[in-house]
A protein has these predicted regions:
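Solvent-exposed alpha-helices and their adjacent loops that cap or buttress functional pockets
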Residues: 2-3, 111-113, 135-137, 158-164, ...
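Catalytic cores of soluble, metal-dependent hydrolases
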Residues: 4-14, 20-93, 105, 111, ...
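Active-site metal-binding loops of divalent metal-dependent hydrolases
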Residues: 14, 98-99, 123, 174-175, ...
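Short active-site oxyanion
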Residues: 90-92, 166-170
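Active-site histidine-anchored catalytic micro-motif
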Residues: 91-156, 261-262
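Short, structured patches in soluble enzyme cores that scaffold and shape functional sites
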Residues: 120-123, 147, 168, 173-176, ...
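A general structural motif
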Residues: 150-154, 172-178, 205-206, 247-252
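Aromatic-lined glycan-binding groove of carbohydrate-active enzymes
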Residues: 166-168, 175-180, 217-221
Length: 299
């Protein structure tokens, strides 16, 4: 399935879904860290779609959900753009922004894939609802929306939900779950590889199992990669740092295996926050990880 002839780079400079502002500067930081040069060295044809126009803050009010209407507007526009990219047989590579933009990414993909597999690389499960979320930040609900968990206006964005199926989803790198999320993961049958599982099985076995799950009966596989899946010592520039994450080599190895599978049909990299970074270290790492997904090798 992967790779199509062209990679379409879509920047989404949007950070209202996160608890701390700054991730809206992530796409530019990733570009500044040498993304185009890296892709050029890989001789990959790249179409730069430019930044998606993001809504201005207009004091939307919702009793529990922060920036609810801005997030609906943003993801409605993002879904249309992602759908357009897929329709041209190009590979959508979405650069966030916070993880609430995943709602628009898979909403656009769902207009072309009826049984989408999803690899959710993240310290968190992002399966909260307006009732279970301790913060009201929608970046912690983005996967849940795809499964039909959440307010109708979010789940009814064209293609947004409920369009994903629990049996087609794999969480990797998880290490902080709220009580409601634990319960939902157990009851729904979503496969979750926590850091404990990675320690016990090794990343190679985890990825073998993960790829087996997301390619079984699916017609496409989307990678949603939150940079906070890595250990904060490797990736300090992100808003919700949880110690004890995926190592530098584990992350690269996982992405190299995804490239070798030739099954990934779209990807997004989110939650790079340059205002919290150390010398653009996290943005540079993100460029390297994207390169591993797209075929960069040591030899």
């Amino acid at each position: 399935m992967m790779m199509t002839e062209t990679v379409s780079l879509l920047s989404v400079p949007f950070g209202y879904g996160a608890g701390r502002h700054g991730s809206e500067m992530g796409p530019q930081a990733i570009f500044n860290a040498g993304l185009m040069r890296q892709l050029s060295e890989l001789q990959i044809p790249v179409q730069d779609e430019g930044p998606l126009t993001v809504p201005q803050h207009y004091n939307s009010t919702h009793p529990r959900l922060k920036y609810f209407h801005e997030i609906i507007e943003l993801n409605t526009n993002l879904a249309a753009k992602v759908s357009e990219i897929v329709a041209r047989n190009s590979f959508p590579l979405v650069l966030g922004g916070d993880h609430s933009i995943a709602i628009g990414t898979y909403a656009g993909l769902a207009q072309h894939y009826k049984n989408l597999g999803v690899i959710w690389f993240d310290a968190h499960a992002d399966l909260n609802t307006e009732d279970s979320s301790p913060s009201g930040n929608i970046h912690g609900m983005s996967l849940g929306v795809g499964l039909g968990r959440g307010p109708d206006l979010l789940t009814q964005i064209k293609g947004a939900g409920p369009n994903l199926k629990p049996e087609n989803i794999v969480l990797i790198g998880t290490r902080q779950l709220d009580a409601g999320e634990k319960e939902y993961i157990r009851s729904s049958g979503i496969k979750c590889f926590t850091m404990h599982d990675i320690d016990r099985k090794g990343m190679s076995n985890v990825m073998d199992e993960a790829m087996s799950i997301v390619t079984r009966g699916t017609d496409g596989v989307h990678l949603s990669f939150d940079i906070d899946s890595l250990d904060p010592l490797e990736a300090p520039g992100t808003g919700t740092k949880i110690p004890g994450g995926v190592s530098y080599r584990e992350a690269h190895f996982a992405l190299e295996l995804m490239y070798e599978s030739r099954k990934i049909t779209s990807a997004e990299f989110v939650e790079v926050n340059p205002s919290l970074d150390a010398g653009n270290k996290t943005a540079r790492l993100t460029v390297e990880l994207i390169a591993s997904l797209l075929g960069q090798r040591i030899l």
